[in-house]
């Protein structure tokens, strides 16, 4: 959005051409999401405490989990809007990959929000039942996988690390594999959330790596030089990864020991899905 407005003046103001570079916009989106989270983080924690939105833990859980009862949760309600706003500010909005990832973020975020909301009104660790949550996750992942598979120029070949000559074509089998990975990663991150920095730490490491690979795969020269698959348009995902990275670093400030805020299912489910 903001990138497009700046683009209109590039012919008149030469130094604005720097905004054409993905690396520069990635730095901006990382800083944008980081600063916004720092500014709004304290307000969000106070608001959640006022609304009595606290962490609920099963009675049979380990002692270090039980000690976290009452800590404000649903921090994802701040995390996700910051990620999306920063992405909308600095990303190329005509890129289908950006919109596909944001679709997954919104849908999994809504599933997580309903789950957290039910836990809050019931004042227990019971949210959405597995019979309700799992089919919804599979449906969203299935839509995303099908859209990606049908995208013109999409390559369903699987690249095996360290064996560049082995590239089996998955064909339609790519869709169920993608669904399995997306849903599995979503629930894996969800399971780790609940202790100080336990979920957000690996997320920061993972998205830092994704940021680099998205940039390399989206640049035909570097992809060819490093002999990695070239995916046209994927470079713009670097900007989105920067937004996730910045917001996650801001969240870590409040989630590190002693944790003042947890992301809840509304944050862990979509971040895990995007990770997948």
Regions from the PLM with identified roles:
Residues 94-102, 121-136:
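Membrane-interfacial loop-to-helix junctions in multi-pass inner-membrane proteins
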Residues 3-13, 50-51, 63-66, 74:
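N-terminal structured helix/loop subdomain that forms the ligand-binding/catalytic interface
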């Amino acid at each position: 959005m903001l990138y497009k407005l700046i683009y209109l003046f590039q012919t008149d103001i030469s130094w604005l051409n720097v905004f054409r570079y993905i690396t520069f916009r990635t730095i901006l989106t990382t800083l944008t999401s980081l600063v916004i989270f720092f500014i709004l983080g304290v307000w969000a924690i106070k608001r959640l405490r006022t609304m009595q939105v606290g962490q609920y833990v099963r009675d049979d859980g380990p002692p270090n989990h039980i000690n976290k009862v009452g800590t404000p949760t649903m921090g994802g309600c701040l995390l996700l809007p910051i990620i999306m706003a920063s992405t909308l500010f600095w990303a190329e909005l005509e890129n289908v990959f950006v919109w596909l990832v944001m679709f997954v973020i919104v849908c999994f975020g809504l599933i997580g929000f309903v789950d957290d909301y039910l836990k809050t009104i019931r004042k227990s660790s019971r949210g959405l039942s597995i019979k309700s949550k799992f089919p919804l996750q599979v449906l969203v992942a299935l839509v995303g996988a099908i859209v990606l598979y049908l995208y013109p120029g999409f390559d369903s070949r699987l690249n095996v690390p360290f064996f560049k000559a082995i590239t089996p074509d998955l064909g339609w089998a790519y869709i169920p594999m993608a669904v399995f990975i997306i849903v599995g990663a979503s629930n894996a991150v969800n399971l780790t959330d609940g202790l100080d920095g336990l979920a957000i730490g690996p997320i920061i490491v993972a998205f830092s790596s994704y940021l680099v690979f998205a940039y390399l795969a989206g640049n035909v020269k570097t992809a060819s030089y490093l002999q990695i698959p070239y995916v046209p348009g994927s470079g713009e995902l670097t900007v989105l990864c920067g937004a996730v990275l910045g917001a996650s670093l801001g969240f870590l400030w409040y989630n590190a020991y002693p944790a003042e805020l947890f992301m809840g299912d509304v944050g862990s489910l979509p971040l895990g899905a995007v990770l997948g």
